[in-house]
Amino acid sequence: MTDFTAKAQCSFTDRYAPKKDQLINISEFEFRNYNEDTDFSVINQWLSQSYSSYWGMNELTEDQRNLELKNTAHKFGLVGLKRGKILFYTELYHPAKDEIGEHYPVQEGDCGMHLIIAPVDIPEHRLSQNVITAISSLILEHLPFTRLVVEPDIQNEKVHRLNHLIGIEYSQIVPLNSKTAKLGFATKSQFLQSQGKVSSMKNSSKNPSLSLATSHLTTEYWHKANQHLIAKMITELSHEQIITPIKLDDASNAQAASWCITFNSDTGTSEYLFRARQYQLDHLFVEPQSITCTKDDKNQPLDAVSFILSCRHLLEISDALLPTYLEEITSTLYSKAYKLMHQNKTSAQLANASYQEIEAAMTEGHPVFIANNGRIGFDMLDHVEFSPESGQSLNLQWIAVLREKTSFAVIESLSYDRLIFDELGQSQLNEFNQQLSMQGLEPSHYYLMPIHPWQWREKISRIFAADIANQYVVPLGTTEDKYQAQQSIRTFFNLSSPEKCYVKTALSILNMGFMRGLSPYYMSRTPAINTFIANLIETDPYFAKKQFFVLKEVAAIGYHHSYYEQATRTDNPYKKMLSSLWRESPYAPDQHGNVLVNKQQKLLTMASLLHVDDQGKSLISALMADSPLSDHNWLKQYMDLYLQPLLHSFFAYDLVFMPHGENLILVLEDNSPIKIIMKDIGEEVAILNGEKTLPNDMNCLAVDLEDPMKLNYILLDIFDCIFRFIAPLLEQQTQVSESDFWEIVADSVKDYQQEHPQFDAKYQRYDLYCSSFARTCLNRIQLNNNQQMIDLEDREKNLRFAEDIANPLALFAKTHRII
């Protein structure tokens, strides 16, 4: 690898440029630093000729060109030599310091590139291709960059063809001051694939891609990741009454108090000191930077895995499951360090970012679960390629599956043919059908379906080998559409055509207590369930009044593997490996041409509200600051849109969703909330009335629970899992105190109940102002069984509880309760 001077605090040029007299040999070329004294006269002649017009320097004077080529802190030039003669010049630059950086979220390790090749008297076969390939190799294999960025003129077809040959994938057209450009990217993986080097990427211990996949594992980022996760462990394990911190002083909530936790074990006594504020719902808001650790009175570095081992006797986790849990903890730390390194936008900047920019910038994951980024099954390169925080665009793999072995279902207003035509287009559909025909197969005997590239590579190609050999499953390749992984990791948003469907795929990795497969049996019911719920929402004028909508899962497909169907009658991950579904996009027009989101509005998942940047500033406070509404009115409007429709679902229909942050999309205008869109309906909705008459194919929705547990769908899922985290952020960073927050919640409940007196009996039966409610402990559930936390057929079986928790709304019972 090239010797370069790389310090994080150095300028782009100091960090990445080769040393002064260094020669870098790649293929038939030598690279060295641009020398103004000896090289400018040569390159100046090139830039004055018409063939170099896309550089925009034809009309400049010699002095102006000389100034443009000078190295700066943010760009440097290299010349390429062949047999000692200068053949080309390339400029490498920092996109964040260039105009192009205003048009996309620049990532750590991005490198922009410009190129000009000397005019030649005698054309040389593939010269331009060989030059651009060598430059790409320099950037992605020899220098420590992770992504090549290009922005050629939209009319420069020659360069577009060359870029395609090095794996560049264009994402968008952008208007620049001097041109209209195509913005494109190539990662190390994409470049190697374009050169046919994929097989060596994962196997060569000397390959730079391996170090790039661990470049975030520095002492600084690892310390911060452990600091963050231990703070979360203290918060959540104390909330679930697994550990009991001791308060050392009597500071008020305006200032954090000092706390202590002591663990005694066979290996010694560990003590953690920290500062934290105490909030409602037994929530400790820990200051991560305040945490210190000693073991037997000796200072220790912060280590989240050691924290777990120190208190393992309190966790009630089996010896068999503990190693897997520790792996999940380590993977979560790995992911956090990656996010810390690549977190390049403040919350204030994200408040004005696009939907997918925000989605890729999220750093926490589920706010309650400690081991929430396990992703067991992904290696380090998979993490870079497929994780939501990498923000990578990718192509989904498509296959054909024999219809007689496949379950396919679609909503009544759609058909398979219409769906596939809308998603693929006629040209791509013809290409796939032609592939089948050329293999002697009848296209009408097959369904086409998208799958996750990792799932194809790691699972389907091997476990379904017999089906592939027998042409029950036929690989077809990829389409041109680019997708981005969402926070839920197995769901993809179409970047190329945002109006097309989300695609949710089976992904056989273990993440947060589940193997993330999709059951083909459940796929067969999914569109009908979505239609049933959507009809209920759409025909009730209250939901329309509150601007509460759902995104339907309009079609679903699942392949049945005959071996595993015979091997086990019970639920099993092997039976959930090959399924996908299509979900409506919020940008898709309805049958009348109307869309949920117009150009003045923007989207973000509700999980984004809890995002905190590296300066400790939350996104929800940044949105409030940028909104014309007061902080209190912003929050009231949010409760009107979010809480009240969920109350109506519960009291009017016994209907509950899983309303956590990733399942809801918040629509904003002027950074004020105006709509709520619920998604992920199929697997995470229930009717809490076992006696309620439902259509035959809807019986799976009925859940028979005791009344207190029904109420937990609001008190736990909304209050404890969402509001518990929002309230402290608002108290610390806005004009909304914690008491203000819960009063606004109580007012919202009261307003709803007064507007709907017909449910008075239910308000008394399900009392939202009750003194306390069941403390359902999600981390205890994961510790009990981190392979499958919840049995969807029996949701209560694996639940774990501690002492009941005080309800913040009880303070308002006398003034707000409907009597």
Swiss-Prot record:
Multifunctional enzyme involved in the biosynthesis of the siderophore bisucaberin. The N-terminal domain probably catalyzes the transfer of succinyl from succinyl-CoA to N-hydroxycadaverine to form N-hydroxy-N-succinylcadaverine (HSC). The C-terminal domain then catalyzes the ATP-dependent dimerization and subsequent macrocyclisation of N-hydroxy-N-succinylcadaverine to form bisucaberin. Pathway: Siderophore biosynthesis. It catalyses: 2 N-(3-carboxypropanoyl)-N-hydroxycadaverine + 2 ATP = bisucaberin + 2 AMP + 2 diphosphate + 2 H(+); 2 N-(3-carboxypropanoyl)-N-hydroxycadaverine + ATP = bisucaberin B + AMP + diphosphate + H(+); bisucaberin B + ATP = bisucaberin + AMP + diphosphate + H(+). Disulfide bonds: none annotated. The keyword RNA-binding does not apply. GO terms for molecular function: acid-amino acid ligase activity; acyltransferase activity; ATP binding. The gene is bibC. PANTHER family: L-2,3-DIAMINOPROPANOATE--CITRATE LIGASE (PTHR34384), STAPHYLOFERRIN B SYNTHASE (PTHR34384:SF6). Its EC number is 2.3.1.-, 6.3.2.64. It comes from Aliivibrio salmonicida (strain LFI1238). Residues 1-190 are annotated as: N-hydroxycadaverine acyltransferase. GO terms for biological process: siderophore biosynthetic process. This is Bisucaberin biosynthesis protein C. It comes from the Bacteria.
